[in-house]
Curated annotation (Swiss-Prot):
PANTHER family hit by this protein: DNA TOPOISOMERASE 1 (PTHR11390:SF26), PROKARYOTIC DNA TOPOISOMERASE (PTHR11390)
Family the UniProt entry places it in: Belongs to the type IA topoisomerase family.
Enzyme Commission numbers on file: 5.6.2.1
Active site as annotated: Y315
GO cellular component, one term: chromosome
Keyword list, A-Z: DNA-binding, Isomerase, Magnesium, Metal-binding, Repeat, Topoisomerase, Zinc, Zinc-finger
Region (Interaction with DNA): 196-201
Protein's UniProt name: DNA topoisomerase 1
Organism: Methanocaldococcus jannaschii (strain ATCC 43067 / DSM 2661 / JAL-1 / JCM 10045 / NBRC 100440)
Domain Topo IA-type catalytic, residue spans: 157-569
Cofactor dependence: Mg(2+)
Amino acid sequence: MAEIMTALIICEKPSVAKKIANALGKAKKKSIDGVPYYELERDGKKIIVASAVGHLFTLVEKENKEFGFYPVFDIKWVPASVDKGKEYVNKYIKALKKLSKDADEFYIATDWDIEGELIGYHALKYCCGREKAKRMRFSSLTKKEIVRAFENPDEIDYGLVDAGESRHILDWYFGINLSRALMNAIRAVNRWKTMSVGRVQGPALAFLTERELEIKKFIPKPYWVIEALLKDNLKAIHEKEKFWNEKEAKNVYEKIKDEKSAKVVEIKKTKRKLKPLPPFDLGTLQREAYSYFKISPKETQEIAQKLYENALISYPRTSSQKLPKDRKYLEDILNIIKNHPVYGKWAERILKENLKPVEGKKEDPAHPAIHIVDIPKEELSEKEKEIYDLIARRTLAAFWDNAEREYLNVKIDIKGEKFKLSGSRTVKEGWHEIYYFPKFDEIELPPLKKNDIIKVEKITITRKETQPPKRYTVASIIKELEKRGLGTKATRAEIIDKLIKRGYVIDDGSLKVTDLGISVIETLKRFCPEIIDEKMTRDLEEKLEKIQFRKIKKDDVLDEAEKRLRKILEEFKKKEEDIGIYLIKNLDATNKKAKIVGKCPKCGGDLILIRHKKGRFVGCSNYPECDVKYSLPDKGRIKIPNKVCDACKSPILKIGDREICINPECPLKQVEVKEEDRICPKCGAKLILKKGVYGAFYGCSNYPKCKYTEPINKKEVVGKCPKCGGDLVVREGKFGKFVGCSNYPKCRYTEKLKLNEKEEK
């Protein structure tokens, strides 16, 4: 009897391996050292479905040279377990090696993109000792797609593999060498600070800094606006909109301020048809998710990937705005969606009337636009529901009718001065019925005709100022990076995330470049502008694309990049000490500024946040001449919100989640306390009244030997904590009173307040 052939399918993640195994047959789950894999039989063939866990291999130096040595270009691929926190990768490598020994043929079933091709190829090459395999390509994890991909396999795309390897190598070349160069510049002046800059992060931070400096240097320019408040709460604005000359504005105002009527001199009515919005590419999905739900681009990408792995949507990392051309494929999906309680009626009409979807301009050689493929069978999290709903509605709306809007522009005359008012309304909802997220202004004007007289209630003149350019948001920056050709659809969200993590940028609703970020860019711009030149980065991105399509060779691009970088680093080394001095000067100024809390009430000096081995406090910069000092708690992360207390005008600090006034004598902290002898229950010494940033409290007179404290209004004990034996006391939270352990935060036991306890309180 002939031996049964064994096929090994390598997936990107364990969850995808399970999906693929169950789609191909009745799979049996097994494991090697805790690593799951699946076995099944299909068409007389034994199939093993196993997985990687993302990238199993990473780049390191071939030889460990002295600490901080650069430039380094001699690198190799090794198991990713060398990275901290990635030790678990070894188990997956060993499992694939073991499973590959009995395999006769191999399939790669990782994500169909550059990273997926590289993950699969590396697993095949370094774990299985093979260079060739069949390639399963799919854009969704539905059973039908998986079976089709298995029965009609492709070959490995070595252009994608080369492009993937080249991207990782270039990122290593630039990231490691430039970061070491910066740190060595600081070491050259006998200082130390961890610094980093990357191939794409540098140019991205550079144009963010450019915008930040525009905002800092912006000088507001005054202008005047004249408006007429009309009957029925209508508001008309002078046709000039902005008066840049105050005298001219006031002359117009004086001329018409007492007028009580306006004459309609012109009416223009226009209708516009608004086509449905095209289906989502990743960048547009990220922007819309942030705009409507404030979900960050990085989180949107992660949620979309999870929805894809659960076979609810198609592959999310796509540039396409076009749905698949295969009508049968779309009809199969619509036949599933028509059973949905909300989307069903729309899917039914699309099927019944054979409606065709609109397309956007963007294309992707591998994947169609993001679209739904199934209905959730399990409960989704709130954010998953929002992203799924956004994609579902956008998919269905692409098939729908145009929306129709009517716009009314009216010109009125007030004593020879022309004013304008406008209205708009929706005539036909069309696709907006389904994808209702974009806001349509509905401004109804009363029926008006030429020569009508309208009552004027009031004329106003308002001085305004021009506003600085807006900062980018985490969503708008994705569009800007795409426009400038920096990064890829899969990496742009991560680029911004790294800039935030490194302290170069903060996200408080918009992206603000920190003083640290500005000082790094100013240093590089002055001494080594090539590092932050986006033309060089864009050129490399274009070459990576050419590698992908086999138009140029990988080695040629890497050799050219190495020569280019060596030249940059040679110049950098010549100026190393100057760069270090300039960078430290900027960093010291930044650090000093970051520690300033406010002004000293005694001498007018700066109040500075000081961290000392004996504790934390705020002290005057003019010490020892000025001895103003405010103690701070030992625990809790401190932030400086640049606010002052309404009651005493002292600076406010945010410690943990609480904003507090640093002044212990603040009127808001004063309490009336009866004089009474109190004894410390811990050591027997006398308890004395003390004042701190949180207000007055009792503390042991034997401090610092005894650190016992208790609040002035000590909470009444209502029982013993079943978890730690501490006292249970009545506390008050944002949802009302409850019983909690007095040993919080060490013990977080809580319970509901009983009725009799409420009555006693």
